[in-house]
Each structure stands twice: as C-alpha cells, then as structure tokens.
Amino acid sequence: MGAQIRVYRQKISSTTSMRKIFKAMELIATSRIGKARARVAASLPYANAITRAVSAVASQSEIDHPLTTEPEQIRRAAVLVITSDRGLAGSYSASVLKQAEGLNELLHAEGKEVKTYLVGRKSQAYFDFRNREYARVWTGGTDAPEFGTAREIGAALLADFAADFEDGGVDEIHVVYTRFKSMVTQEPTVIRLLPLEVVEEEAASESDLLPLYEFEPETEQVLDALLPRYIESRLFAAMLQAAASELAARQRAMKSAGDNATDLIKKYTRLRNTARQAEITQELSEIVAGADALAS
C-alpha cells in the first residue's frame, strides 16, 4: 500500500512540473500574439495600397502581361504550403497539410502536375516521412516571419513561373496557409497567387472609385515594377497571418494541456488520499486484531 502512495506522489509531482511548463508556454504565446496581430494590422495599409494600384493598372489598361494572362493550358501548378517550425500548437500544421492534400488531389484530378514548395519544418517532416518530393523548403522563424524571406520565396516562385515547362516551369501558383480571424478562429485557406487574381484584404466599397493613373513611360514597365512587389506583399501577408494563427493555436493548446494537468493532479490526489485512508484502516484493523488476540 505504501508503494502505491509513493507512485501517486511521483505522478502528482511530475504532472505539477509539466503544468508549470504548459503555463509558461501559454503566457509566452499570449504575449507574442499581440505583437503578431500588430504586425498583421501594420502590413494592411501597404498591401491594400499596392493592391489598389495593381487593380487600377490591370482594369484601365489593355495589356497582355504574362503575370496577368491566363494560359491556354495549365500543365503544372506550384503549391506553397506554409506550416510551423515547432509543434505544441494543436492541429495547426495538420489542418494546413490536410488542406494542401485536398488541393493536390483537385489539381491532379484536373490533369495538372504539382510542384510543391514548403515553409516550416513540420511540412518538411511530413513530406520526408512519406518520401515525397518538394522543390524547395524554407525553415526558421515561422512564428516571426521577415520580409526578406517573403522576397526570397517570391523570387523563387516568379522564376519558376517565368521558366519554360521543359525547364521545370509552372503555369500557376497556389498558396496554402492559415488565415487569422480571431483568437478562437483560424481558417486553413487557399489562394491563387498567379496568374494574377487581385484580392484586397479589406476591399473598398463599391461606391469608391479606383484612382486614375497616367503611365510613364509604358504600362508594361509599371506592371513589371508593381507585380513583383504585389506578390511579395501577398506572401508576407500570408506568412504574418500564419504566424498569428500559429501562436493562437499554441496558446489554446497549452491552456488545454494545463487544464488537463490540473484535472490529473486532482485525480491522483484523490487516489492517493483513498490509498492512504485504506492503509490507515488496515493498520487500525491489525492493531485491534492484535489487541483482541492478547486479551484472549
């Protein structure tokens, strides 16, 4: 009986230590979410401004630009999957990968090859474990993305988009990431990056008119300058949304783990007390039995 009590004491001690770790990680994630959300909000003015500029150029100009023109036949599609570097974030990365798998099945059903690009060690581990190929991977800092990384990813995707099919080029580019809606709601999302589909995060009302531009010297040159920056801003916005979603998912996961640890501690404490009470009862019974034996 004493050994059983010691086991419960050890379980209570180890679970209490884990609860402290969970609580610390929850507090860290909570403190970082505010910064992540602030970065998302700070990126919106630039993203919306360049989106409106690209929309105005594309809508007011009769041009045939490779980044805005739908190809006659789409033979190969690129899919960029944005997950986390670290775990302990509940089903965050698993939900993104599930969304990516659904997109892959859809593209294959349409007769398209799929060329995959990865962001985050979780997606890399997922593909490595299944011996599946991917073109490139970027890891490090998924919970605090830098614009330089978005620029590097954008350059790689644009290079493959401009390349010929025989050289590994792609005809369209999709991005799979997690859209941050609120602290309790994050939604795995797919967007088509190229050919251009202008999507403004906070669209203006229908009564607002797009600005009128005079192009100097040529409209194509304006698009050549704007579109790469537009792609970079869309990628960076997706990475910032994913980072905020990752931290929110980790905060919820750690809170849930801490609550479960508290429940386990209560359970083990109750079992320990029951075992201790049984031990005391047994000892008293033995004492009474011994006294009765001596009296007789």
Swiss-Prot record:
Alphabetized SUPFAM superfamilies for the sequence: ATP synthase (F1-ATPase), gamma subunit
InterPro entries: ATP_synth_F1_ATPase_gsu, ATP_synth_F1_gsu, ATP_synth_F1_gsu_CS
The entry's keywords: ATP synthesis, Cell membrane, CF(1), Hydrogen ion transport, Ion transport, Membrane, Transport
Family (UniProt): Belongs to the ATPase gamma chain family.
Native organism: Pseudarthrobacter chlorophenolicus (strain ATCC 700700 / DSM 12829 / CIP 107037 / JCM 12360 / KCTC 9906 / NCIMB 13794 / A6) (Arthrobacter chlorophenolicus)
UniProt xrefs under CDD domains: F1-ATPase_gamma
Subcellular location(s) per record: Cell membrane
Topology of this chain in the membrane: Peripheral membrane protein
Domain of life: Bacteria
Gene: atpG
Subunit structure: F-type ATPases have 2 components, CF(1) - the catalytic core - and CF(0) - the membrane proton channel. CF(1) has five subunits: alpha(3), beta(3), gamma(1), delta(1), epsilon(1). CF(0) has three main subunits: a, b and c.
Main function: Produces ATP from ADP in the presence of a proton gradient across the membrane. The gamma chain is believed to be important in regulating ATPase activity and the flow of protons through the CF(0) complex.
Protein name as it appears in the record: ATP synthase gamma chain
Molecular-function annotations in GO: ATP binding; proton-transporting ATP synthase activity, rotational mechanism
